[in-house]
């Protein structure tokens, strides 16, 4: 009480270190989320390319399977065989040998199609999971950005109020 003149002195020095720490933490979180989001987006694009390629390969194999099934069906059609008028040796070469080769190729292509279908399902699941992760990260990032913006706005508002109070106190004093 150096001045005992009855005046009251108000000092309003608001400590903004908590706000600065929180803002710094939010900035770090935003930076980390941006990095993760960028990485996941790259993964998604890569998965999308792989999924497209695998789907196209499976479709092509499916078409080959359909053609081979028709071929095997035709080579088993007695009416068609009789209409061709094959001799015994021609029948052996034109029907039996071709049918055996077509059936073997059909089995191979069906096995390949099964493998490709599994790969498409696996890639599709990974793509969906990555998309969900990206959506989740985007929501978190948006929330962090909003929180940082609000914190900055609140800190700025508090600073202006403090300046106004200090100015009013200076005028009153």
Regions found by a protein language model. Name each.
Residues 2-91, 95-173:
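Residues at a specific register/face of alpha-helical coiled-coils
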């Amino acid at each position: 009480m150096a001045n005992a003149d009855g005046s009251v002195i108000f000092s309003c020095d608001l400590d903004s270190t908590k706000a600065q720490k929180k803002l710094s933490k939010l900035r770090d979180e935003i930076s980390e989320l941006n990095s993760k989001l960028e990485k996941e987006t790259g993964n998604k694009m890569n998965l999308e390319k792989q999924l497209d390629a695998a789907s196209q390969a499976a479709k092509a194999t499916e078409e080959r399977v359909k053609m081979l099934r028709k071929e095997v069906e035709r080579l088993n059609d007695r009416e068609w065989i009789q209409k061709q008028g094959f001799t015994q040796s021609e029948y052996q070469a034109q029907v039996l040998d071709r049918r055996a080769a077509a059936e073997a190729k059909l089995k191979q292509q069906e096995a390949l199609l099964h493998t490709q279908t599994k790969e498409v399902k696996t890639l599709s699941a990974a793509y969906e999971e990555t998309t969900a992760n990206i959506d989740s990260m985007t929501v978190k990032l948006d929330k962090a950005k909003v929180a940082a913006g609000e914190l900055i706005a609140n800190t700025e508002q508090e600073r202006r109020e403090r300046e106004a109070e200090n100015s009013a106190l200076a005028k009153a004093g």
